[in-house]
Amino acid sequence: MGMAWIVLLLGAGAIIYNHVYRKRMYREIDRLEEWKINLMNRPVPDELAKVKQLNMTGETEQLFERWRQQWDDIVAVKLPNVEEQLFDAERLLDKYRYRQARRLLGQIADGLRRLEEEVHEIIHEVNELIGSEEQSRAEIEELRAAHREAKKALLAYRYTFGSAADLLDVRLTEAEKQFQRFAELTEAGNYLAARDVVLTLKEELGRLTAMMEEIPKLLGECQTSLPAQLAELADGYREMEERGYILDHLHMERTLQEKREKIEQCLAMIHELRIEEAKQIVAELKEEIDALYDLLENEVLAHQYVQTEMPRLSGMLQELAAEAKETEAEALFVQQSYHLAPSDLEKYRSIEKQLHQLQKRFFLIQDRVAEAKTAYSLLKEELEQLVSQIDLMKEEHEQFRTMLQTLRKDELIAREKLDGMRKTLAEALRLVQKSRLPGLPEPYALELAEARRSLQAVAARLEEKPLDMPAVDQALEEAKAAVERLYERTVEMIEQATLAERTIQYGNRYRRRYPAVRKGLEEAEFLFRHYDYEEALRQAVAAVEEVEPGAFDRVQKLWQEDNSREQ
């Protein structure tokens, strides 16, 4: 039973699918039919009718014939073929030959697409021809006006174009012939060729108009402005030479001649209407002439610099020499009192050597200024180098002097530090005296002796001649560590002794009742009398805490309160 249902359902499904598919194929036939009718109704005849308004000769006639034949072929042959194919597709569908029908419909769609492009191309070409004829007619009038204006300007202002006027004449006459050519081509119906003539004319007249704007200005530069600047440069150069400037290195006469030749070259280019090249050369010439002005101005500025810097540098070097002498005396004095490292002495000798070299260079420059054979710009360069070297040397010299002063300052600081440590040691001993201890433990006595020895070592280093500051600093570091350690040890020892004494006193209340406490306290007293305050405190605390836990905290608290009252 189930199997029969499945077969039935599958059969029903196949029938439905078959029906839907056929319907879709018929719809596609209708769409292609509509497309074919649409193509047949395109306004190609109307477009071709517009062409007939033009001169139906030459190129236009040939094009019209080609388009008309193409359209006739589409309407009479190609579209009826499509109609035939659509009819075949319908027959195949009726016979349920779907695959063949589908393939045929695909071919029909491709054919219609190609026909669509062909029709589009015909309409586009027709519009291009008509458009180019309209545009050319409008533009040729504008170009005639531009040509007339150019001829008028050339006639009225011929002198402003110099020798370029003849070639401009030739070019404008050549352009005039193109108007005749345009008329002939239009008459012959060759509108597309006529359009090319319009575009060529437009370009040529644009070029000529631009040239006619630029030539007078360029001629002005080459015939008046630039030669005047060269003459001014030549005068300035001669005048400076007469005033004693050394300018041989500028090779000015040869350079000016080169510029004059360049101007001639530029005029020849204008004559040949090579205007862009001429503009380039004029721009270069302007830059080069500016550079020559700058060179002469540099010499004037360099002369001023040399005049003002020479006396200033002479003064600076004298001042440096005097300072170096003072430094030498100071170094000798310091050397007797202090130990100077070999590198420091070497630095001073190098400063001396540099100073002599700088003086020698300055005298050489002085001689060259007096000789008046060297350009001021070159002398200025040498002086600038000398100035930077003098500045460097001043800096080195200053560093050396600072180092000498630092040595003496370091000695004073070292003596101050030694005094401070002596005071710290005296303060530690005063605390010991004030606390009235029965005696000093041996380790403490050894530390005290060590601290005193370290202070004596610093004092001895400070008495040495010459003074070796790195060794003094080393001794100071060691003494500082020893004294600080001793002071801390003193405070700690006094605290332990006082707390031991107070804990023993506090524990006395338990002596009679507790033999163990008595024994512990007696031992603590024995240790106290033998200066072992740390162990005495430990024993006393252990004995008292045995019978009264927390007793040591109370003793400590009372002692801290007494201390704060005393302070």
UniProtKB/Swiss-Prot annotation:
It is found in: Cell membrane. Residues 22-567 are cytoplasmic. Pfam families: EzrA. The chain crosses the membrane at residues 3-21. GO terms for biological process: division septum assembly; septin ring assembly. Residues 98-159, 251-497 form a coiled coil. Negative regulator of FtsZ ring formation; modulates the frequency and position of FtsZ ring formation. Inhibits FtsZ ring formation at polar sites. Interacts either with FtsZ or with one of its binding partners to promote depolymerization. HAMAP family: EzrA. This is Septation ring formation regulator EzrA. It comes from Geobacillus kaustophilus (strain HTA426).
